[in-house]
Amino acid sequence: MGTQNTPPNFRPISRHDGLFKERVHDSYKSKEKPQEPSVCSQCGAVFHEGRWQWLQTPANAHSLQCLACHRIHDHYPAGFLTMKGEFFLAHRDEIMHLVHNHEQLERKEHPLQRIIAEEEKEGATLVTTTDIHLARGIGEALHHAYQGELDFHYNPEQNLLRVTWTH
């Protein structure tokens, strides 16, 4: 089996009747950027210079609901962080302190990254977040500080991340 010689004037014809990959639909993500400046009517975050920030509200700002407040209102998280294991149960208060500190640090720079809720389930704690990056960041911070097992399951169709930390 050798290589085939292609004639010099040969042009491949591509077919246009193939299957196209379906786009991910995230109803919480706007198709367009908000008008500038805009302010969230619930949390006060300001959309300015292409991103959400914590700023003084400009006098001419448009009022809207940011994506984080929308997810919180609908109880529809993008990130799920489950923490479990004997070490977790023995050091729960200290670990939850790290979780909240990490969220506060991220929220200062990224107003849309917030914890929605915390729930105790069968010896584990579930923390839900408004953003997949926050769930991942908290999981990585836990792993860095305490080791243990860290597992990620990303669902691109729903833009959803499940993080499990066990120790």
Positions of PLM-derived features:
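C-terminal edge-of-domain segments
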Residues: 154-167
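Hydrophobic side chains in well-ordered alpha-helices
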Residues: 95, 137-138
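Short Gly/Ser/Thr- and Asp/Glu-enriched loop/turn motifs at secondary-structure junctions
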Residues: 120-122, 158
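N-terminal cysteine/histidine-rich coordination modules
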Residues: 1-74
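Surface-exposed, low-hydrophobicity interaction/linker segments
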Residues: 75-113, 117-118
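Short cationic amphipathic helices and targeting signals
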Residues: 123-129
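Helix N-cap motif at beta-to-alpha junctions
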Residues: 130-135
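A common structural junction motif
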Residues: 143-150
